[in-house]
Amino acid sequence: MQLEDAANEYLEKLNKGDFRGFVKVIEKPDDKAELILSDVDGSRVYNPNTALRTTMYMSLLFAVSKLTSIKHENDYPLIFDAPTSSFTGAKEGDFFEVIGNINKQTIIVTKSFLTEKEDDLGEALVDKEKLSKIKATKYRLKLKRPFNEEDLSTIQSVVEAL
């Protein structure tokens, strides 16, 4: 399986029901490569929307991860920071479905499962119904309260299993 084929497989999964085009990896003469999006006729898609551009890069990352796993080379965890911030609710669901089917350690830092509602301490509540759809071990990272807002040394993190 080639890198482009694997990337386009993931691009399709991440963009169900939306325009997705095709990922192309263009080799440059200086041993570099450029990732572009093309239309069915092969013409380049300039300035795709933020969500499509994000899924294009994600699809390449997933493809590299898949191909290195197949070749039994180094298997590294995937780490994402706010990966779905530009996604609609449906596209966010597609992302988590794809992640759920990748058989490797994945760490995702996101606020996607926090609600506008707060508890008695003023902390955002977790949307447990939405979170229950994610088939993975889940943790919440939050600030230990109280802390002094003017003294960095008072900041501590709490990891809570969900």
Question: What function would you assign to each model-found segment?
Answer:
Residues 61-69:
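Metal-dependent nuclease catalytic cores in nucleic-acid-processing enzymes
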Residues 91-162:
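C-terminal lobe/lid and adjacent interdomain/linker elements of RecA-like ASCE P-loop ATPase modules
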Residues 74-83:
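Walker B catalytic motif
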Residues 1-27:
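Amphipathic alpha-helical domain-onset/packing element
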Residues 48, 68-73, 98-102, 115:
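Conserved catalytic network of the ASCE P-loop NTPase/AAA+ motor domain
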Residues 1, 34-62, 83-89:
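Conserved ABC ATPase signature
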